[in-house]
């Protein structure tokens, strides 16, 4: 049996399968199919729209008996670069759901495009933004470069622990 399920289609049948096998589920915010999502970045209010989306899906999953849900805010999926940065800055607001928040920004275009580099060259920018993600509520980082992410988390933890003294 799989350890974890994620699917950005949010298919009700998939939710039933997740419930049946008592699997953790990563619930990602996404507005559309991959080939159309970047055409659908106009939100009346990004945060209210996302909160409503998550509330609806979480209710459905809970009603089916799914206990382990992780929120993925869907960086890069149906959001402009500006929306992605605002989302990173304000992701702590999604703690209202009392669920772990997964942040997946590693090598995303929001990093490499403004730096005019390739995705494979975006390690420094990724590390820099991972620290902000942790500061702003990320519990889980989805990464490409595991050792570098572990180093970032270790240094961030030292920083946070020294802030408490």
Regions flagged by a language model, labelled:
Residues 3-63, 78-165:
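Active-site-adjacent loop and "lid" segments of alpha/beta metabolic enzymes
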Residues 74:
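Conserved Motif II region of HX4D acyltransferases
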